[in-house]
Amino acid sequence: MDLKKKIIITAAGCAAILCAFAGVGHLLPKQEPIELETVSDEVPAEEEKAPFEVEAKGAVMVDADTGQVLFQQDAHDELPLASVTKIMTMLLVIEAVDDGKIDLTDEVTISQRAASMGGSQMYMEAGEAHTVEELLKGVAMASANDGCVALAEYVAGSEEIFVERMNKRAEELGMRDTHFVNTNGLPVADHYSSAYDIAIMSMELYKHEKTREWFTTWQDTMTVGLPGKEKEFGLTNTNKLIRQYQGCNGIKTGYTADAGYCLSASATREDTHLIAVVLGCETSDKRNEEVSKILDYGFANYETHVVAEKGDVFEEIDVEKGTPRKVNAVAAERITALVSKGETESVVTKATIDKKVKLPLIKGDEIGKLAVYDGEEKIGEYPLVADGDVNKASFGELVSRFFDSLF
């Protein structure tokens, strides 16, 4: 058989194989996975105690980037949380904004029920209208009970339906020691949470950058009242720590006689972002003192090391039946590891790439995982995604590649 016939037969066989596997992309990663060195140390496990106690019924501190627990004291005890409830209320509203279901500029008419709320409020009257953003600002800064009910009714049709969604969202977030009965935390039976659960929803809310404007604004004004009876209402942030504690940038205070003085506080210094929660303190000064003590401990003992920035490349992938043939597996998000100050133990990252993907591949599609280890212990796993689109290679392209491989 001459060379020409051999090539024709070989090409025909190749075509049959290519047809059989059309549409499936085989990822051929490099032989050696990329490992990235950084520094780390063991941090207190969830059941471990910090070397001091605070005067609170429940307390916790977490790394806001990873959720790693750095301090806890009765962190899972079910306790009343007063206006700290409003973290979940704000979360559902801002998620509705991000999902395009409502807009910050939408006008909300205040119902009689919303206007009748007692406690901290903006003293709005039934029938007046305010934007979603104005109401959110009032809730974040002045802890407005009337604003909570108005927003709940606008988003869900009624406060009751909105509360059902609050409990569903809590379940989705893994908040196992939480049950909501209303949107604002006014005293009612069977309404409770834990310091740990509050930290979880605080982390989630803080992901929404718009809310940070309201958390860190000390004073503002808004106009309230029916047409012809308008008046200026002053908003003063209930969280004094935003002016008293270095790096404090949120989040929410709370107080009722039953709950005591409560606070979920966020603070950032350089790359380290911590969230500390206290429940059931005896005075507002004690609440601020204990939160400050916890945060001081965190910043004194830990620092954040950036393992990868969003878009960092961990593998160059050969997509066998794709065009283009190459795509990078990159970090889908910024990845950090909290480490003890002064320690130099290594954190190692290892990329694992999926063996096959369905084509076409869209930029941002997950194609692997990045595992982060502290010694032998896995401390996190993060998605690796494609940094570009990969379409199915045409039959002609595949045949051309085959012949290129022969010569």
Can you annotate each of these PLM segments?
Residues A12, F52, A56, V108, ...:
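Hydrophobic alpha-helical segments and their boundary regions
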Residues L18, A45-E47, C262:
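A generic local structural motif
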Residues G25-Y196, I200-E209:
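Active-site-adjacent loops and short helices of periplasmic peptidoglycan-processing enzymes
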